[in-house]
Structures are given as structure tokens and as C-alpha cells.
A protein has these predicted regions:
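Short, conserved beta-strand element in jelly-roll/cupin
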Residues: 81-98, 116
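Conserved metal-binding segment of the jelly-roll/cupin
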Residues: 109-129, 138
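A generic "binding-loop/recognition-motif" signal
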Residues: 94, 103, 121-122, 130
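Double-stranded beta-helix
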Residues: 67, 73-74, 92-94, 102, 126-187
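A short beta-loop-beta micro-motif enriched in histidine and acidic residues
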Residues: 73-87, 102-103, 110
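A generic structural motif
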Residues: 98-100, 126
């Protein structure tokens, strides 16, 4: 792993939360793949500014075949992506993010946390503080969409047929994606 020293993934400090979300109203979530929340995934040097942090996270994701696509916050309305899995790294600040659609599970995230959302997972920013900023990335070859309505049966089948990413966005050839997603794919 060649991560920028400004952000150092440290598997020994990771606290992993894994959970599945059932379909909820118009939000499909993902029946096979769990949400993976990497707490303390990135040991971020507090002396570097947010732009340097974001660039270092982008380099890490790029190295692991998850090309970064944007820097911003998370939309404050419920939505999901049907054409791509998504990884979100918290560059600065902290927030409460709802996963699963309206009435879903609230995840409190802070600087250095990473959220891995399988395609179909509803998410929405509930509240944020401390100049909340995120880097968003998607597996190589997957183009994200923004959905706010139910999928057709054909779209649902396409979503469930998306290929597995080739590596974990944080740890590469090892890590939670390999453990939890590949295991789920064999069920």
C-alpha cells in the first residue's frame, strides 16, 4: 500500500460495523450486500488542510481502483444509486447520515470514517457540523446515477447484477469489502 502519509489506513485501529437493510418503500437497499462502516479507517494528520486531506484520500481510492468523482457534502434528501456501489470518506467535520431511506438507520460519522454503500442503499444527510466534507468514489467502470423513485423490475435486476469491485477502497486486496461482500456474494 502506498497511501500518502497524510492519511494512513491502519487495519489495527479499524472498528467495522456491518449491517443489512431491507427494502423500504421506494428505496431498494441491497438484499445481498451489507453496508460497511469503517470507523477510524483513515488516521488523518490534523496539521494538513482539508484540500490536502481530500487529495490524499482520492489518491488512496484511485490506487485501489475506486476513482474519486467528487468532493462536497452528502445530499440532504433521500436518494440511492442503482448503477454503482459508492464509498464516502469523511474528510472533515461530523454528521448524522440516514441509511436505508426515510425512517432508516442513523449513522454518526466523523473525520476519518468511511462508508461503503452497496448499490441501492438509500442515504441522506440529516445534520452536519464542523465544515463537513466528503470524498465520493465509485468502482472503476461503474457510472453513478441519482434515484428518488422505485426501480422497475428490469432496473432492479440490473442493479443486483452489478459486478463486485476488484478491491477494498481503503485496504486494497484485503479488508472488509473482501470479507463481507464476497462472502455475501456466495450465499
Amino acid at each position: 500500500m502506498h497511501a500518502d502519509p497524510a492519511i494512513r489506513p491502519d487495519a489495527t485501529k479499524l472498528d467495522i460495523e456491518v449491517f443489512r437493510l431491507e427494502p423500504h418503500d421506494w428505496v431498494p437497499n441491497n438484499r445481498k450486500l451489507p453496508v460497511v462502516l469503517y470507523r477510524n479507517a483513515l488516521q488523518i494528520d490534523p496539521d494538513i488542510d482539508a484540500d490536502e486531506r481530500a487529495a490524499a484520500i482520492e489518491a488512496l481510492f484511485e490506487e485501489h481502483q475506486w476513482p474519486p468523482r467528487w468532493r462536497d457534502s452528502i445530499f440532504d434528501y433521500h436518494h440511492f444509486h442503482s448503477t454503482a456501489h459508492e464509498v464516502l470518506a469523511i474528510v472533515s467535520g461530523e454528521a448524522d447520515v440516514i441509511a436505508g431511506g426515510p425512517g432508516g438507520r442513523v449513522m454518526h460519522v466523523r473525520t476519518g470514517d468511511v462508508m461503503l454503500l452497496p448499490a441501492g442503499t438509500g442515504h441522506c444527510l440529516q445534520s452536519a457540523s464542523g465544515r463537513f466534507s466528503v470524498v465520493g468514489a465509485y468502482p472503476a467502470g461503474q457510472q453513478w446515477d441519482i434515484r428518488r423513485e422505485a426501480l422497475t423490475p428490469e432496473e432492479w435486476a440490473e442493479m443486483e447484477g452489478l459486478p463486485f469491485p476488484p478491491s477494498d477502497p481503503v485496504l486494497g486486496r484485503s479488508g472488509p469489502l473482501i470479507v463481507y461482500w464476497l462472502r455475501a456474494g456466495r450465499i
